Amino acid sequence: MKQKKHYEGLTDTEVLKSREQYGANVLTPREKEPLWKQFLEKFEDPLIIILLIAGFLSIAISCWEYWGLHVEDGAAVFFEPVGIFLAIFLATTIAFFFELKADKEFAILNQVNDEEEVEVIRNGNTTTVAKKDIVVGDIVIINTGAEIPADGRLLEAISLHVDESTLNGESVPAYKSVKEEEFEKDASYATNQVLRGTKVMEGHGIFQVEAVGDRTENGKVFEAAQIDDSVKTPLSEQLDGLSVLITKLSYVFAGLIIVGRLMVFFHWSPIVWTLTVPTIVFFWLVITKFDGWKWYSKTISTVAYFCILMTCVIVFHDCLMPDKSMAGLLAHALNTMMIAVTLIVVAVPEGLPMAVTLSLAYSMRRMMKTNNLVRKMHACETMGATTVICTDKTGTLTQNQMRIYQTQFYALANQTLDDGLASCLLKEGIAVNSTASIDYTDASNPKVLGNPTEGALLLWLKDNQVSYQELRETVQVVDELPFTTERKYMAVLVNSALMEDKQILYVKGAPEIVYGLCKQTDCNVPKEDIEHQLEGYQEQAMRTLGFAYQIVDGKTEVFKDGRVVADNLTFQGIVAISDPVRSDVPDAVRECMKAGIDVKIVTGDTSRTAKEIGRQIGLWTSNDTDKNIISGPDFAALSDDELDKRVKDLKIISRARPLDKKRLVESLQRCNEVVAVTGDGTNDAPALQAAHVGLSMGDGTSVAKEASDITIIDNSFSSIGKAVMWGRSLYQNIQRFLLFQLTVNVAACFLVLAGAFMGTESPLTVTQMLWVNLIMDTFAAMALASLPPSEKVMKDSPRDRNAFIINRSMGWNIIGVGGFFFVLLLVLLYIFEHADITALRDILHLQLGEVNGLSPYELTLIFTIFVMTHFFYLFNARAFETGRSALHFKGCRGLLFIISIIFIGQIAMVELPILQKFFNIVKGGLSFEDWAIILIGSSLVLWVREAWHLIKSSKE
């Protein structure tokens, strides 16, 4: 802003002393719980509690076998419970580690807030520093839309209104002034005081810092900025519903396993059949009638029911099976309950929240590197479903590097400034009717602070050897009207040395608006000539400004109701300012249009300027007509019904106001579009809040940033396209995790269920199922949640925001592949039960005989084949709908690391003697030949997919 006085501000030495005495301008976050306590909180997870119950049940069985039955294995019976507890420890440790990692990613918002630049005066020069570097004694300049960085006392205030609702709850902005006669006695805070965290809604001012950091009013009630993850998006609601469905199905399988194992144990006794009825009724009630119950509540009730059921079995034991020992019955019952509970644990997708969290954390970090700062978590997902982007022109489509292209000041000969009155009026008007300033810290590269358009004018003065600071110091500001997008001009009334006993009114803004306020023109230039000049500039996509002045006496009313009412203004001329299109924008717009996303320009510029920019970026074509463009006034005149019929055809709204942008968003939403909108000003906040995704600009106001969901740090449209790509990729990563997990679910649940009714030992033991669960949930979440985005997603149409996350292709994959794995393993289970297999190659020339049960070697084969088939299927899931080979690993170091852990872990589990005991693996493990056959056979799932991919690629 322009200063009424010259301020020196603090020197570098004084800054260091102040920081040492009063501290840094950083709010100390609340002390976090120690890491050990956070780790122990993981054991409060209901899933972990249920696993602990299973572990203690396993200990009970082992104790019974060791002391009651005196089994031959001796202490080896305790390896299974130890394995369960090791699995629990591993699961909690991994979850704890990645939760810490995600927290660090989400903390980035606070760090960025502290790095925001603030305009200050130091060493007699206006410059910018990070918010955290503000110190007591600093002179800070604040403008409309700024967030006040520290507590202080106002030195100057022009039409200053501040939103203090974050501190006092008042919805009406507080008026601020340095004039004692305007002080409000009943105000929550002093009229000449400004406070950290409050926002300038109108006007501008200068204040001196009196308190920083924890000593500010805001610091006393500090609550760290958080990424908002409380919003229930369509995706999160779908995932919640999917989890409920999977949980219900897991109870069906658990109930059937209990029934099946009991019937087999009692040789299908008729009395046992009577126990199936209450079991079926119980699970039906739990699944259908108690939707309000959490899944772990249902699991605990299942355990309680099972205890009651087993009590009934024990009571009728002598009638059912007098030749079976009570000890054997109890051991079988406990083992059955453990298998049922573990299956529920395996089936419930507890890894889904981790997959979503990791996907969000990873996406947010990588989006930050592509200049997208995510402020609200749901925006990551919603950007992927965006169908329309409503974008500003200046700074987003253009470089925002304003330079004076040409001047047309009618009183200047050869457009050269001199010492004449006309030149002096122009120089003074440009200098004082401005809120911008220039940072001369680096004299060879002056930096514009504030509005780039106004900065271009100040640089033009500099190029003409005119000091805007000296001009500002020679005048006294009497009154002013700040620029607004509604008025489209700004004005200032000053006491000037150019006119003794007179005042001068300077007006600057949109040429047609300013010219409309004027009574005459310098040198009597005809209106037609001015219009012709403007058309020429606008057709070159130039931004234009008009200038006017009036000399008045102190009694003339010049402002009324926020408008200029002076009636004798003289139009001085126009300035054309160039702002080239960003070089990467045409390709980015083309990419969005190929991705099925409509782009609409909403700008305050004229229709000619907007159309030329649209043409340069490839949006406006020779086929477009007047139905594709509309001016702000015409737009406002449309009824809602008329607008809804026309809105999809619109490509450009010129001379738009902020409320036009909000109304455009609402109309598009009524037409079932998912809308992202850009904004940088305070008045853009309503549109940013109304859109599905609000995109604020990095150099936008704090008000706009707070209203937005994502901040585009470099202001570029190409960064918006990257945000869409990341949003689509995040959604696909979650789909891939679900594809893999549900395929494993289908195979595991049906395999264990088949084993229960076939009367064999459970094909997968408790510890083996927990290892599968670790692969399926934790490791798969880690592997698939952090996959880099594929540019192929930008060739697809936007997804239906409300469509079910499991699409038709996924459904067929889950049923087909999961069913195939189940049938394959069921066939092997049947063969192993009816043949004595000592080497896997025996399958090629075997003869089936009577049922002889499963040997430890055969169970080891089943377990290893199950894991390795799904291991290779993980590659397929990773490549799902990418159009790439499953062996394409560019940028997937994390995936390769996790795949290596799974592969090495499985080999170690089968071959290391100490782990063999924990996971019920046959002593001695498998032979090299067995491993070769298993790896070659199970990898066919990968090679078949690759062959199909090659066939499709060749056809395309």
Regions found by a protein language model. Name each.
Residues 1-798, 803-806, 863, 880-956:
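Conserved cytosolic headpiece of P-type ATPases
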Residues 168, 837, 841-843, 878-882:
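Active/binding-pocket-proximal capping segment
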Residues 744-748, 813-825:
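Core segments of transmembrane alpha-helices
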Residues 756-765, 831-857:
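Helix-coil boundary and interhelical linker segments in multi-pass alpha-helical membrane proteins
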Residues 800-820, 849-861:
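Membrane-water interface at loop-to-transmembrane-helix junctions
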Residues 819-836, 906-918:
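Alpha-helical transmembrane segments and their membrane-interface junctions
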Residues 867, 875:
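Active-site pocket-lining segment
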